[in-house]
Amino acid sequence: MPRLHDHVWSYPSAGAARPYSLPRGMIAAALCPQGPGAPEPEPAPRGQREGTAGFSARPGSWHHDLVQRSLVLFSFGVVLALVLNLLQIQRNVTLFPDEVIATIFSSAWWVPPCCGTAAAVVGLLYPCIDSHLGEPHKFKREWASVMRCIAVFVGINHASAKLDFANNVQLSLTLAALSLGLWWTFDRSRSGLGLGITIAFLATLITQFLVYNGVYQYTSPDFLYIRSWLPCIFFSGGVTVGNIGRQLAMGVPEKPHSD
């Protein structure tokens, strides 16, 4: 007669079927207590929460911040254009023909909006180029430095209208040195130098086109109907607006990318 322990401790043969075992996930779910008294599951890590719930909130926040920065830069460009144009008119540097004043271009109402739009484009372009090149600008990133840069730029523009040199070549070389000094003091980035030169070239071309078509004119033009020092003003203005755009972009989350 077989004994009980022979059946209990007998090892199954190779051909015998192995007992079925539940998956670990089902076992864990069965062992976890359910009901109102059960402990709440641990929250997911912060990175995972930002990757799911934050993904849908970031695009709207990014676009909202973009609009805010555009409005700030546009307002700055409008105010700066009014101030600098007033300095130029006081020194009798810029003259508007009578036939232009009598038309819709009276008091040059179109100049401040154009300068504001250009300031918004340039101010948004600088941090975008930095992000694209993978070289974030970290040199003197504080508002005090930005305000000093604005003051130096206004001083350069005021000097272009007030200082009297023996000839315009000396004035142009002096302003070019001051503009490069402004870039070296407040920027020192290759992208800032390249964008400043590009802005100076394009803005001078547009100004030459407007002067050539009689929209306005300069007293004593010395280089293709315009002042030869004008590219220096555009260069230093581009660097100044770029610093403002970079400062406004600090702490702004990057544009979300959809995989």
From Swiss-Prot:
Instruction: Give the matching InterPro entries.
Output: INSIG_fam
Location(s) in or outside the cell: Endoplasmic reticulum membrane
Record-listed Phosphoserine modification sites: S189
Mapped to this chain, the residue ranges on the Extracellular side of the membrane are 90-108, 165-167, 214-227
- GO BP, sorted A to Z: cellular response to insulin stimulus; cellular response to sterol; cholesterol biosynthetic process; cholesterol homeostasis; cholesterol metabolic process; cranial suture morphogenesis; inner ear morphogenesis; middle ear morphogenesis
Locus of motif KxHxx = 253-259
Which intervals lie on the Cytoplasmic side per UniProt?
1-66, 127-141, 187-191, 246-259
Post-translational modifications reported in the UniProt record: Phosphorylation at Ser-189 by PCK1 reduces binding to oxysterol, disrupting the interaction between INSIG1 and SCAP, thereby promoting nuclear translocation of SREBP proteins (SREBF1/SREBP1 or SREBF2/SREBP2) and subsequent transcription of downstream lipogenesis-related genes. Ubiquitinated by AMFR/gp78 in response to sterol deprivation, leading to its degradation: when the SCAP-SREBP complex becomes dissociated from INSIG1, INSIG1 is then ubiquitinated and degraded in proteasomes. Although ubiquitination is required for rapid INSIG1 degradation, it is not required for release of the SCAP-SREBP complex. Ubiquitinated by RNF139.
What is the protein's membrane topology class?
Multi-pass membrane protein
Q: Which Pfam families match?
A: INSIG (PF07281)
User: What tissues has this protein been observed in?
Assistant: Highly expressed in liver and kidney.
Q: Which domain of life is it from?
A: Eukaryota
Induction entry = By insulin and hepatectomy.
Which keywords does this chain's UniProt record carry?
Cholesterol metabolism, Endoplasmic reticulum, Isopeptide bond, Lipid metabolism, Lipid-binding, Membrane, Phosphoprotein, Steroid metabolism, Sterol metabolism, Transmembrane, Transmembrane helix, Ubl conjugation
The domain section of the record reads: The KxHxx motif mediates association with the coatomer complex.
Q: Which family does it belong to?
A: Belongs to the INSIG family.
Assembly behavior: Interacts with SCAP; interaction is direct and only takes place in the presence of sterols; it prevents interaction between SCAP and the coat protein complex II (COPII). Associates with the SCAP-SREBP complex (composed of SCAP and SREBF1/SREBP1 or SREBF2/SREBP2); association is mediated via its interaction with SCAP and only takes place in the presence of sterols. Interaction with SCAP is mutually exclusive with PAQR3.
Recorded protein name is: Insulin-induced gene 1 protein
The source organism is Rattus norvegicus
The gene name reads Insig1
